[in-house]
Amino acid sequence: MSFSGLKHSITQYLEEIPSQVQTRLYKSPATCLAIYRLLPTLAKFFIMTVIFNDKDISLRDLDRWVKSNGKLQFQEAIKSMKSLHLLIPTRVNGQLLINLNPTFRESFRNALTGGEVNNSFGIVVDEDRLDTVVNLAVLDEYAATKWETILHFMVGTPMAKMPSENVLNLLKHSKLMEEVPDSSEFMITNEGFQFLLQEVNSQIWSLLLQYLKLAESLHMDPVHVLNFIFMLGALETGKAYSTENLSETQLKMLLDMRDYGLVFQKTSNPNIFYPTRLAQMLTSDTKSMRTASGAMESVLNKPDDAAKSTDDKYDSLEGKAEDIQDGALIIETNFKLYSYCNSPLQIAILSLFVHLKSRFANMVAGQITRESIRRALINGITADQVIAYLESHAHPQMRRLAEEKLQKKLELDPNCKDPLQVLPPTVVDQIKLWQLELDRVLTYEGSLYIDFDTAQDFNMLCKYAQDIGALLWKDDRKRKLFVSREGNAQVLEYAKRKIKKKEE
């Protein structure tokens, strides 16, 4: 899920809550600031234009500010603001006038001007009142450990420490993981693998959206839940904040947010918490690396004043070796794969659908095989997801060669409609064929009966198995039959009775 798609999901959730709840939300300046950041660019422009104007404005006047080729964006901006009840429409003498929601306007003004914010941005604790100051390095290590513990668990990496019970329940509730029948173990689902392909900010919000839905079933106040989430995104990393103004619901949330690595608390002083860099990503447009571990490293090791987009780095095909993204891989037409990574998490993700053979200091080598793809398919990963993962992590050199090849085709035939093929077509086609092969074949657990003395014995047992609904397959010529696991005991008992009767 791209961050634009994620914004749509968050906005959609906010649109679906009752207007009375929305009005309560808008009493928090921090929440208003976060919602403003989620709006389309044109909607932000309109809000900043009218925020200090208490008079009603004609919708036609706003329309005049937009060029003819931007009418679609204009409609989307107005629609998004109306659905969130940020605009209050009125009709005067047949003319449609609009103005900002008064509650939102007052809170957003206070957020911009530093007015009365009612501690919605947290209560900072002076360092003089702290026994020890927690530095950024500790917070970064804590956040990385907590978050990657969740990701490692999802890909099945053997770990000394499991995620908390709350995290496991959320993974199960969000259908990212499912329990293996007759076992206490969990396995990743189709949605879970797609989750691993997302950027870290998208991953965090995907979990928190499920947390919001789970909170509803637990009768937690949605206003307190949302206010706390948006507040975390507005806090300053490295500062200590007091729990003094938090509600009972938010204090409970604080314990859950610790499990996700969004906040840090010292056991010796539970009245103080520290937001981590992961919490900053809740209201940030900054895009992270495509890989899970690479994203963590990028966000946690990035200086506060670093504003360079990582997309610029990835879009540049010419670069130094150290500029190549962690996990960039090369695939040959013989299905051999080379991935430039040394992250245990990245290697664990690859092992879900690649047979890894060798590991070096900064690279792993393996091969995509029928068995490795079948294992991934059985675990709920689709062929399209595997292909999408390989394409998104393709080495820049592979992308450049693919673009050069497509450019030559366009020079010969300007009407060429061929897509950009980053991966070898043989690899893509074969992965899809392996999925079709698995879709055609159904597997059943049961027992095979062979070596019948006579055709009469075979037909008799075959008829009995068919009558009780246990017969799955038979071969009259070779005198073989296959019965289900559930019906095998009955068929076996029947066969023993007939053999005993025959011997008598």
Swiss-Prot record:
Cellular compartments annotated: Nucleus
Major subcellular location class: nucleus
Lineage top rank: taxon: Eukaryota
Gene3D superfamilies: 3.30.70.2610
Gene Ontology biological-process entries: nucleotide-excision repair; transcription initiation at RNA polymerase II promoter
Coiled coil, from the record: none
Example GO molecular function: ATPase activator activity
Record-linked InterPro entries: Tfb2_C, TFIIH_p52/Tfb2
Keywords: DNA damage, DNA repair, Nucleus, Transcription, Transcription regulation
Pfam families in alphabetical order: Tfb2, Tfb2_C
Family to which the UniProt record says this protein belongs: Belongs to the TFB2 family.
Role of this protein: Component of the general transcription and DNA repair factor IIH (TFIIH) core complex, which is involved in general and transcription-coupled nucleotide excision repair (NER) of damaged DNA and, when complexed to TFIIK, in RNA transcription by RNA polymerase II. In NER, TFIIH acts by opening DNA around the lesion to allow the excision of the damaged oligonucleotide and its replacement by a new DNA fragment. In transcription, TFIIH has an essential role in transcription initiation.
UniProt subunit comment: Component of the 7-subunit TFIIH core complex composed of XPB/SSL2, XPD/RAD3, SSL1, TFB1, TFB2, TFB4 and TFB5, which is active in NER. The core complex associates with the 3-subunit CTD-kinase module TFIIK composed of CCL1, KIN28 and TFB3 to form the 10-subunit holoenzyme (holo-TFIIH) active in transcription.
Protein name, as recorded: General transcription and DNA repair factor IIH subunit TFB2
Encoding gene per record: TFB2
